[in-house]
């Protein structure tokens, strides 16, 4: 019974009808949750309602994001105002210690920064008001609209469930059966009641969403107008102060800061002290480069002398057998790499160097032969007429070239080997006289190798002045015996 004493419609419904109504409503909820396709005509009838729901969800999300942005903005304003105020105080403190024009500029700029920091904090007042209004709007207007939408969704689910129920009953409808017609009329009445409730809530939702959007626009326009007015006033005052400082400092001379030591009144000019320092630093750098290059050159010459001594000692150990096998060595050398004009162009400078030092090498070998009693001293003394031509000829090839260069012209190497073999044979005879008519065929003593080696070492005499010239061409045992 209701308040007027009339029976309610629910009291006349049986338990079976309530169960059936609950069943179809649950089936509609399941269809919506699983995302199954519904009747396209039924969905098209709710297109306007769905558009209003999208607007509501957009308003709800934007209000939440706006609250977060306002909080971050207030925090950033406080931080930048604090940093600006500290910079202004620092400039004012430094201006008290400086009585020059720079001190005046720093004092004026520091005062402007402190004033700007205080005025920037004034922006927090309209922002706080905006935040409060947005929070109130979200808590009341948006929440009330959300409650209405939830009731509307329940009514729509119930209405669509009743439609499914009526569709199922209509498939079993038989006009000749009075009982089935009565059942269809009851289901049809349920559909009409649910549709009326749904239409009423649908209208309420559409009206509240429209009112929600309009109220949000009014709120934001009022709050943001206050914020905009405050922001424009802040920038106008700050720009005015900065322009006044700029106009006051127009007559001041600019300063060039050099290593943060002192201020200069004449821009684009470097002081004499700095020039001297730069010149001194440049000279020191160049001197260091020269010293390093000399050390590297001396180190390379020492390494070359050591390698050459090792190669010469190996040649002395092998002796004549080395020359006996020289023809085979010449045959094994690649002919393509030994022939041509490239070798003569690359190593032509050695002939000039060795020929220029031939006279000095002959004097040095004579002193060595006199000091150590070489048996071939008499032989070399008997040949003064040969002069510079044999020495020049012998200085064109050094035994160490086989180790340093690793390749030679095949023909020239074979000629040299044949000459050496003939000379070794002549050195073992009883000092036979050499005819003067054939100056090209020379008899060489074993000390000619030492003479050639001394000429080779004279090339490095300037690079390594500390080496012992008496030790050239002799082993350690011979020096100890001497």
Curated annotation (Swiss-Prot):
Region of interest called Disordered, as start-end residue ranges on this chain: 365-393, 427-449
GO molecular function: protein domain specific binding
Domain of life: Eukaryota
PROSITE patterns in the cross-refs: AH
CDD domains (UniProt xref): BAR_ICA69
Disulfide pairings: none
GO BP terms in the entry: regulation of transport; spermatid development
Transmembrane segments: none
Gene Ontology cellular component terms for the protein in this record: acrosomal vesicle; Golgi apparatus
Polar residues biased stretches: 366-385, 428-449
AH domain residues: 44-247
Coiled coil regions in record: none
InterPro entries linked: AH/BAR_dom_sf (IPR027267), AH_dom (IPR010504), Islet_autoAg_Ica1/Ica1-like (IPR024114), Islet_autoAg_Ica1_C (IPR006723)
UniProt name for this protein: Islet cell autoantigen 1-like protein
Organism encoding this protein: Homo sapiens (Human)
Taxonomic path: Eukaryota, Metazoa, Chordata, Craniata, Vertebrata
């Amino acid at each position: 019974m209701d308040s007027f004493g009339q029976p309610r419609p629910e009291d006349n419904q049986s338990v079976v009808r309530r169960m059936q109504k609950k069943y179809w409503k649950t089936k509609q909820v399941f269809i919506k949750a699983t995302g199954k396709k519904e009747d396209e005509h039924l969905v098209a009838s709710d297109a306007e309602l769905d558009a209003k729901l999208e607007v509501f969800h957009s308003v709800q999300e934007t209000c939440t994001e706006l609250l977060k942005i306002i909080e971050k903005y207030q925090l950033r304003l406080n931080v930048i105002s604090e940093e600006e105020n500290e910079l202004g105080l620092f400039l004012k403190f430094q201006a008290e210690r400086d009585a020059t024009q720079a001190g005046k500029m720093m004092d004026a700029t520091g005062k402007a920064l402190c004033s700007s920091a205080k005025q920037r904090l004034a922006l927090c007042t309209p922002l706080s008001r905006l935040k409060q209004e947005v929070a109130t709007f979200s808590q009341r207007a948006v929440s009330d609209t959300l409650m209405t939408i939830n009731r509307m969704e329940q009514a729509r689910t119930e209405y669509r469930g009743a439609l499914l129920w009526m569709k199922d009953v209509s498939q079993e409808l038989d006009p000749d059966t009075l009982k089935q017609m009565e059942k269809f009329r009851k289901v049809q009445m349920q559909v009409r009641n649910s549709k009326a409730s749904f239409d009423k809530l649908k209208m309420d939702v559409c009206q509240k969403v429209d009112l929600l959007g309009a109220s949000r626009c009014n709120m934001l326009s009022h709050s943001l107008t206050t914020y905009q007015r405050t922001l424009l006033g802040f920038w106008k005052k700050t720009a005015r102060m900065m322009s006044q400082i700029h106009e006051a400092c127009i007559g001041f001379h600019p300063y060039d800061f050099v290593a943060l030591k002192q201020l200069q009144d004449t821009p684009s000019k470097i002081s004499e002290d700095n020039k001297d320092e730069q010149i001194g630093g440049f000279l020191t750098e160049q001197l260091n480069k020269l010293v390093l290059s000399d050390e590297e050159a001396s180190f390379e010459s020492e390494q070359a002398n050591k390698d050459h001594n090792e190669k010469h000692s190996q040649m002395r150990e092998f002796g004549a057998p080395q020359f006996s096998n020289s023809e085979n060595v010449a045959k094994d050398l690649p002919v393509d790499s030994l022939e041509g004009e490239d070798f003569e162009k690359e190593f032509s400078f050695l002939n000039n160097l060795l020929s220029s030092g031939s006279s000095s090498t002959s004097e040095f070998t004579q002193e060595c032969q006199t000091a150590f009693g070489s048996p071939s001293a008499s032989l070399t003394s008997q040949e003064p007429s040969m002069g510079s031509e044999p020495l020049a000829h012998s200085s064109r090839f050094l035994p160490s070239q086989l180790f340093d260069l690793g390749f030679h012209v095949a023909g020239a190497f074979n000629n040299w080997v044949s000459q050496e073999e003939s000379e070794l044979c002549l050195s073992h005879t009883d000092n036979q006289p050499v005819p003067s008519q054939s100056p090209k065929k020379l008899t060489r003593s074993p000390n000619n190798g030492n003479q050639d080696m001394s000429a080779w070492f004279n090339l490095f005499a300037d690079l390594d002045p500390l080496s012992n010239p008496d030790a050239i061409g002799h082993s350690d045992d011979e020096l100890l015996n001497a």
